[in-house]
Structure formats: C-alpha cells, structure tokens
Amino acid sequence: MKYVNKPVPKTDAMSLVTGKPVYTDDLAPSDCLIVKILRSPHANAWVEEIKTDAAKKIEGIACVLTYEDVSHKRFTLAGQTAPEISPWDRYIIDKHVRFVGDPVAIVAGETEEAVDKALKRIKVKYRVEEAVLDIHTAKDNPILVHPEDDWYMPIPVGGDNKRNLCSSNVEEVGDVDAMLEKCAYTVDQVYHTKANQQTMMKTFRTYCYMDHFQRLTVVSSTQIPFHIRRIVGNALNIPSSKVRVIKPRIGGGFGAKQSSVSEVFPALVTWVTGRPSKIVFSRKESMIASSPRHEMEVHIRMGADENGIVKAIDLYTLSNTGAYGEHGPTTVGLSGHKSIALYRHTEAYRFAYDVVYTNMQAAGAYRGYGATQGIFAVESAADELAHKMGMDPVKFRELNMPMEGEALPGYPDVPINGSCTMDKCLARAKEMIGWDEKYPFRDMGNGKVRGVGIAMAMQGSSIAGIDVGGADIKLNEDGSYTLALGCSDMGTGCDTILAQMAADCLDTDMKNIVVFSVDTDISPYDSGSYASSTTYATGNAVIQACGELRKRIHAFGAQMLGVSAEDSDFDGEKVRTEDGKEVTLQQIAGKATCGVCSELQVVKEYSSPISPPPFMVGAAEVEVDKETGQIDVIDYVGVIDCGTPINPNLARVQAEGGIGQGIGMVLYEDVQYTDKGKIRNNSFMQYKIPNRMDIPKVRIEFESSYEKTGPFGAKSIGELVIDTPCPAIANAVYNATGVRVRELPITPEKVAMGILEQEAGEKK
C-alpha cells in the first residue's frame, strides 16, 4: 500500500495553520437576524405569565417567540438513528422549565444591541417549585421532572417519567450472588464520576435561510447532519424533505455536537419570519445549556478465586441524565458492556442500571460515552482486588485480560473476540513505564513520592446493526475523483484517512482525490461522526465504492480497446492489453462524459452487524506531595490495538488528545451546582481544564492486530483513548500514597485529607 498505514499529513494541515478555513459564523450572511434565548433562572418552575409587548416594540426586533408560538409535539435532541432510543420529552419552549438555563423565549432582531435590550424587557412570572438536585433521591421522588402525560419513548427501555426514570434495566448471566459467595476474594465498592464539559473551541452555532424553493437550509457546526435534518423537522412539525443541512468546518465537538443543541432556535425563527437568522452560543451558554458527560455512580462487587481468576462481577450504575433524556438510555449501557468484558473468565455477571431525571443541565454524548465511567470503576476495583490478594496488578490483568479467539462476557456486539493484542499491549506498557523498577512507589525525598498505575480499556467500532457509513465516488472528466461523504471531519482527519483508502483502492495519487462533506442534499446518507464509526463504517463504504468504480473504469477502458476486461489490465493510470494497446484514465474519463450511457460513479452504504472492539493499556507515573496532596502526572504511556492504523500520525494525535481529556476528568473537571441548581463554574475562569503545563510526556505505541471485517484491517480509536487515564492515575495515586479516591476528580484536598486520616489511624 502506498498510503494506508503511512503517516500522511492532513490534507488541510497547511490551510489550518495559515487560517484559511472558514467556520459557521464566517459564512453567515450579513443580513442575518441575531437570535438569542431568554433562559430560566430557576431549576424547576412554571411560567404563569410572560409579557413580551415591550420587547416587541423595540426598533429592529423581528419576533419574540414563547411557548405559545411553538409546536406542542414532543421530540428529542439526541443525534441517534430513528426510532431514537432516547425519550421524546422536549418542546422547543415549554411552559414548564426544568433547569437553570431552560429556554423561556426566543428573541430575533436586526442587531445584537436590540436583541439584548429586548431580552431585558420581557417580564416573566414564575411559580417556583422545589427541585430534584440529588441523583440518590431522584427515583420515585414525589417531585416529578416530567409530570406530563405526553412523554413518549419510541423504544421501551424501562423509562417511566412518573418515577423520574429515563431508563432502567437488569441483565444477568449465571447466579452472581452464589458465585460471589464461592469466591476466595471479593471487593464491594462505589465509584463516582462527575459531569464534565466538552469545552470544544467553537461553541454551538447555526445559521438558517430559506432557499428559492422555500426549503429551510440549516448551516451548522454539527457531527450529525442527517439527524439534524430529522430533528429540525420533528421540532417544527414539518416534513424532513423541507429541510436541508450543510456542515462547514466544525471547530471541535467531542460528542457535544451529537445533540441538536442550537439548530432548532434559528430554524424556527427563519421558518416563522422567512428571513435568514443565526445563533452563536456564548461560552457561558455552552456550559449551562448544552450536553455534558453524564454523572454516574457505579456500585461494583467483584470476586476472584484463590488463583486470581475473576469469576463474578455485579455492577449497578446510577446515571444522571439531567432535565432531559438525550443519550441517557445508551450511555449507561456502555458503562457495563465495555467494562465487564475486560475480564474474560467471568462466569456470572449482573449489570443493572437506573437513569434518573433531575433538575440539572441535560447530559449528552461525550467521548467515551459511558464506557469511561464504567471502566474507571471496574479497573479501580480490579486493583483493589489485586491488592487484597497481595498480587501485582499487572499479573492480575495478565490472568484475566481479553484474548483473541475467546468470549467477551457482557459485550453483546461480537460473539467471539476476533482481533486482539491486549497481551502485547500490557507487556509493552509495563516495559515502557518501567513497572518492575517503580512499582508500587518510590520515595523522592522532600515529602514527595512517585507511584505507577495501570489500566485496561476497550471500546467499539460503530454501533452494531445501526450505524451506516456512506460514500459516493465518481470519476471526473479530467481523470480526478470526487469522494462525497456524509460523515463530519471534526478535526480528527477522517477526510484525509478516507482519501488514503480511496487512493490505494484506485491506485491513484492522493492529490487526485477531492473530498466533499457534508450536504444532506448531495452527500450519501451517513449516521454521523460518533460512536467511533467513521474509519470502520465509512471506511468500508469507501472501499466497496472504490472497488466497484475501479471495475467499471476497467470494463469501460477495455471496451474502448475492443477487448474484454479479462483480456486487459488496469493499473490505476491506463488500461492495457498484452499486445501493447492502451488507453489512459483521462481518455476514459473524457469518453465517459460524451455520448456514452455509462456512469462512472458509485454510491455505497455500509453497516456492520458486529462492533469489533479496539483495546488499550494505559500506564501512568505520578508524583504526589504528601504535605499538600498536589498531584503531578510525570509520565503516561498508551499502547493501543486499533487494528491497522490507517494513518499512524493521526492515530497518535487522537491518543494524545484523548489522554489529555482523561487527565482533565480525573484531576480537575467537575460541573458544580449551587443548592438552587445553578452551575457555579460556567466559564474558563472557574471551570478548570488541563493546560499544556498540566499534561505530561505522553508516549504512544501501537500493537496492531488485523480485524478481518475492518477496512484494511482497521478498528476504531477515537473514543478508546480517553478511557484509561482515570483508573490508571487513580491507581497510581493509591500506590504512591495508600489513599484510594473513589470520587472524581482526585483533588489535592482529597489526597491530603486521606493521608492525614491514615496518619491519625496509625497513631491510634
């Protein structure tokens, strides 16, 4: 292969560093109405009266819309394939506001000044009620977040709005309680992860206009163009055929833009007024009214026999979906399905969960999508079990880790683990971090100690039986190719990776591949860029489309030469016969566009019945100041099995970025609320994410397997890489200090207090 498995530079790298790409707001017409939202100051209240006359009289105001002006048909903002598994529990604006930041009115005007003035002129009378702000008391609470009778769940997954349940389920194989009784060693602990913000560089932003056919065009920074088309249609109660969605450059998403956070507001304004409009969320709005990671509490019981073989896992996840249920029923599933499976000998397991409504910001998708929370719990518990047995945590994992050709307990998306080098990943990570020399800790003097920790992880490659990747490849008259895609490049480099695949399939130079994405009127259908699906699902579609197009080009060239395809060869540049006759690709392309009914264009869709998991081992070295509790990550290594890395450089950058986000989750990030349900840390002044000085040396290596169902043997990588930092660093902190922190983030205060409690206990 000329391009696949090669570190090809991103096709847009130079334009990015020179500032040439334009983003959503750069493209918006100058005559757009400015759209802003009046948001609720209360966590749970009913709008008894809203006066908008004064606001409407302000010069330049085009419309002021309230709950009286919107469709009263419920819908969901979740970017999921229909029928969505998330409940339909929203109106665009509702009389019942359910969190601080819920929309109360939409204002659109000629200038930002006029809109800001109008927002202040709107007078609202609320009936404020007590809010549900604790996940532990939400279930069966007499205060209902969704008391309405038209709450609707397209797919029944245990939701009951009259119990504050978005979803609830129990899966069980074997007799877990009996097996745990037989185990020689058990642990029984609770682990708690908090909500985290995605903090992408570009906030949510959308502009809309009516085209000359009176169709609504939505231009938006989104990961899910085709789902946005359906969601906007549902929200406005209009046919999806009346909606066109165009994705410019995104400016980051990390899952936040897998929900339709901003699109419905300007879409409604443009539909009502007929005028172009735009909305640009402030950073504060993106932090109080978006779709952060689900807060989860995971109670785990784990048991092993006298030899260290894990026999039983009992896992219960309590997940906080907030005021609305986007992605609630699906994220929670990964907390068990992607964590229990890490221990291949498990004979009995139970995975139960409740997803509860609260009067807090609605959660959504974030890289890792629930697996991150579950893996933190299981990999922390695994270390605790190993320590209880007096066994090295690496040895413990060597005995239990996933192996190729064996089953993955609790993972429903592959019958047998078809591709896996976890054993090599573990051995290499152990070697790279210097485990034997550094475990469990080293005293560095001056009150500082260093410890090492390790963790395993797995994810998926698209959603089995649901996700669809699409590719449309055509030969242009000059011999170049246009590759139209329905997936969104969020900065991951998928446009480059898919062009690499196409170039190798067609035996052409990458510069001859022009990539176009995404316009729902032109691009082939694609579920969107989420669930680590693009390389695997869309990559397979690209390979199939290019393979078919290559056959057609060959056959057409052979026809031009008066021979059959079997009696000629095509090398990507020319079709040749053994007697020396030949025709060039450019000649074929030119002929195909002139008086010949032979279209040299192929559209293919791909969906997989399985989701082959990639695997990873992460190992961390931390330094802890025993007096202050300050934690510094000194070194982090990640060894990854993502099948064939199509572009090792881009895969490495993906890993480095995901590890950085994981470090933020484990050490810094925590969406905090007041007792009235207001978010305290709603800007970068208060919400701490790691900067460059907080990220250590990160070293990435690949131990490639070959996934026979993947494009060129590839699996996914995008989400997997955020899953190991939380448990690896938590385990390293424990090994350094003896303090086990089970609630994230692990702050200096928690560590320092833990050390003091240890010392007090020793004195007794």
Q: What are these model-predicted stretches?
A:
Residues 145-236, 401-480, 680-701:
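Helix-loop-helix junctions that connect adjacent transmembrane helices in secondary transporters/permeases
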Residues 1-158, 596:
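Flexible, low-hydrophobicity surface segments
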Residues 11-15, 120-127, 131-133, 223, ...:
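Extended active-site and interfacial segments that coordinate phosphate-rich ligands
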Residues 230, 251-274, 278-279, 494-502:
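Thiamine diphosphate
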Residues 67-68, 237-242, 272-277, 306, ...:
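C-terminal catalytic domains of large/alpha subunits in multi-subunit enzymes
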Residues 6, 12-15, 82-83, 160-206, ...:
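Glycine-rich loop/linker segments at domain edges
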Residues 74-79, 118-121, 220, 229-231, ...:
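Short acidic, glycine/serine/threonine-rich loops at helix termini
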Residues 461-523, 538:
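Catalytic phosphate/nucleotide-handling subdomain of diverse soluble enzymes
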